[in-house]
Amino acid sequence: MKSVGAFVRERRRANQMSQHALAELAGVSQPFISELERGKPTVRLDAVNRVLAVFGKQVGVVDAPRPEVHP
């Protein structure tokens, strides 16, 4: 599975966009784009979703198998 940062970098380059141009479109700073692409952890899901929205994507919550709990 590809990381969010790797996805953003790949899509940005495929669209021949600079980090600055993507930041302007998404309403975030260029350093935020740089940090996101490098995989720096963030709790700013609102900002991550604004970046992903430029490419028609978003972060969401999906059901996952629950780990078995042994008392």
Residue map of PLM features:
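A detector for short, charged/polar N-terminal pre-domain segments
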Residues: M1-S3
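Short basic helix-loop element that most often maps to the first helix and adjoining turn
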Residues: A6-A21, L25
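Recognition helix of helix-turn-helix/homeodomain-like DNA-binding domains
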Residues: G27-P41
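Short, conserved catalytic or interaction motifs in soluble domains
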Residues: R38, D63-A64
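DNA major-groove recognition helix of helix-turn-helix/homeodomain DNA-binding modules
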Residues: D46-V61
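Helix-turn-helix/homeodomain-like alpha-helical modules used for DNA recognition
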Residues: R66-P71
